[in-house]
């Protein structure tokens, strides 16, 4: 609309200059015609000019309205439909994908279905194997399950002696206590201990004491039947444990750990 108005204004200015030159030349012609200036009316050129301007304005308005109707203004057709009717030459469409592929040979459809079905079956089989392999790798192996629990025969352990076995990579002390050892363990004032525990809490059978042979200070292995209290002594930093595995002296903060165990038979012990 603005472009049309600009073009029309430019044409009107040209026509106005032409009309002005025409009127001026006519005025000069009248003045040069030898007639008396008083006999010729002075308002004639201005009347011609005003009428000419009015005709130009009417023509301009009619042409603008006609142009507006041509580009879709004031028409009943939507702008989108009008744009489709008058496409722009700058819009370029890619027609390379408008070609239709030729239909395949009907006799080869069975082969294509067979190939697709076979590929899907192979893919499903490989996926199943991968899932099974992942599940099996997450489960514990037989060696790990065997190390998770340890069965110990207690028949060969003499009273007053300590046996060391390996369980989950750690030493485990199994001590068969005598009657004097049991009395000594129960005679201790629990309130004076650094890590107070009753002896009955640490054993299931008073005759057998089972503890993990790792010092609770820095992980050294204490020596059995040593120390000031007849239990275990850690040579690394001088921690002393009594006959129940409780810390009595030295830098160790806690008692020796008691693992999970149970008695299968009278002389069978299962650790873990």
Curated annotation (Swiss-Prot):
GO terms for molecular function: 2 iron, 2 sulfur cluster binding; metal ion binding; ubiquinol-cytochrome-c reductase activity. Disulfide bonds join 220-236. It is a single-pass membrane protein. Pfam families: Rieske, UCR_TM. Residues 201-270 form the Rieske domain. Residues 133-272 are mitochondrial intermembrane. PROSITE patterns: RIESKE (PS51296). Component of the ubiquinol-cytochrome c oxidoreductase, a multisubunit transmembrane complex that is part of the mitochondrial electron transport chain which drives oxidative phosphorylation. Belongs to the Rieske iron-sulfur protein family. NCBIfam families: Rieske_proteo. The Rieske protein is a high potential 2Fe-2S protein. This is Cytochrome b-c1 complex subunit Rieske-1, mitochondrial.
């Amino acid at each position: 609309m603005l472009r049309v108005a600009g073009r029309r204004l430019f044409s009107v200015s040209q026509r106005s200059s032409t009309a002005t030159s025409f009127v001026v030349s006519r005025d000069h012609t009248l003045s040069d015609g030898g007639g008396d200036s008083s006999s010729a009316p002075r308002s004639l050129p201005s009347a011609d000019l005003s009428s000419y301007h009015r005709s130009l304005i009417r023509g301009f308005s009619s042409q603008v309205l006609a142009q507006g109707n041509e580009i879709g203004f004031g028409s009943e057709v939507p702008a989108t439909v009008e744009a489709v009717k008058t496409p722009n030459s700058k819009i370029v469409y890619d027609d390379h994908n408008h070609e239709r592929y030729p239909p395949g040979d009907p006799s080869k459809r069975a082969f294509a279905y067979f190939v697709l079905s076979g590929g899907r079956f192979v893919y499903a089989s490989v996926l199943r194997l991968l899932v099974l392999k992942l599940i099996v790798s997450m489960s514990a192996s037989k060696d790990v399950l065997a190390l998770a629990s340890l069965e110990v025969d207690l028949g060969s352990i003499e009273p007053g002696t300590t046996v060391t076995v390996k369980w989950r990579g750690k030493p485990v002390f199994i001590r068969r206590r005598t009657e004097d050892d049991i009395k000594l363990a129960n005679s201790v004032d629990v309130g004076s201990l650094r890590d107070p525990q009753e002896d009955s809490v640490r054993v299931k059978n008073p005759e057998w004491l089972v503890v993990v042979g790792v010092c609770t200070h820095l992980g050294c292995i204490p020596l059995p039947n040593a120390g000031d209290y007849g239990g275990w002594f850690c040579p690394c930093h001088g921690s002393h444990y009594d006959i129940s595995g409780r810390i009595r002296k030295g830098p160790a903060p806690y008692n020796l750990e008691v693992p999970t165990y149970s008695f299968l038979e009278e002389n069978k012990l299962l650790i873990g």
